[in-house]
Curated annotation (Swiss-Prot):
Protein name, UniProt field: LOB domain-containing protein 4
Biased composition (Low complexity): 131-147
Superkingdom, natural source: Eukaryota
Domain called LOB: residue spans: 12-113
Span list, region Disordered: 125-152
Tissue: Expressed in young shoots, roots, stems, leaves and flowers.
Gene: LBD4
PANTHER family per UniProt: LOB DOMAIN-CONTAINING PROTEIN 4, LOB DOMAIN-CONTAINING PROTEIN 4-RELATED
InterPro entries xrefs: LOB
Gene Ontology terms, MF aspect: transcription cis-regulatory region binding
Record-level GO BP terms: phloem or xylem histogenesis
Family note: Belongs to the LOB domain-containing protein family.
Database matches in Pfam families: LOB
Disulfide bond annotation, renumbered to this chain: none
Length: 172
């Protein structure tokens, strides 16, 4: 419907042509990606990249890749408007820092779980958490798991020593 009204000349110009104050041609490269009802989208892209550069980039790409390219340019332009110095690199860096903090918290929580399981198994030797232990299955032929057997499972925890854990996060 949009294309048919554009052929008749009754359609409103796209956001790019409106901002650039020019007539929106039927074959306007901007119109499929910058609709008239989203003027800020093109305004940011124009401010960061320039209309001529955006036009060149879109002309060089196959039609099926243009939507993704515009989406990327809009994201990068919005990030640059929010953070003029770092742009999207600042957002990526911030997210990477959050990942690093969360991974450290996860490692501490996993180390705490291992620490609590070891302490529980030493305090209550007959009530281990392992389903293969004789006390939990009641079968004398069950294999008993020794701490050496679990060494491979928690080998990545060797870097966390008990002294660095401090007090338990969940202690009262």
């Amino acid at each position: 419907m949009k294309e048919s009204s554009r052929k008749q000349g009754a359609a409103s110009p796209c956001a790019a042509c409106k901002l650039l104050r020019r007539r929106c041609a039927q074959d306007c490269v901007f119109s499929p990606y910058f609709p008239a009802d989203e003027p800020q989208k093109f305004a940011n892209v124009h401010r960061v990249f320039g209309a001529s550069n955006v036009n060149k980039m879109l002309q060089e790409l196959p039609i099926h890749q243009r939507g993704d390219a515009v989406s990327s340019m809009v994201y990068e332009a919005n990030a640059r408007v929010r953070d003029p110095v770092y742009g999207c690199v600042g957002a990526i860096s911030s997210l990477q820092q959050q990942i690093d903090v969360l991974q450290a918290q996860l490692a501490l929580a996993q180390a705490e779980v291992v620490h609590l399981r070891v302490r529980q198994s030493t305090n209550f030797p007959g009530h281990g958490l392992c389903p293969d232990s004789p006390s939990s299955s009641g079968s004398p032929s069950s294999k008993q798991v020794s701490p050496q057997d679990n060494k491979g499972m928690f080998s990545h925890m060797d870097i966390v020593d008990e002294a660095s854990l401090g007090e338990s996060m969940w202690s009262c």
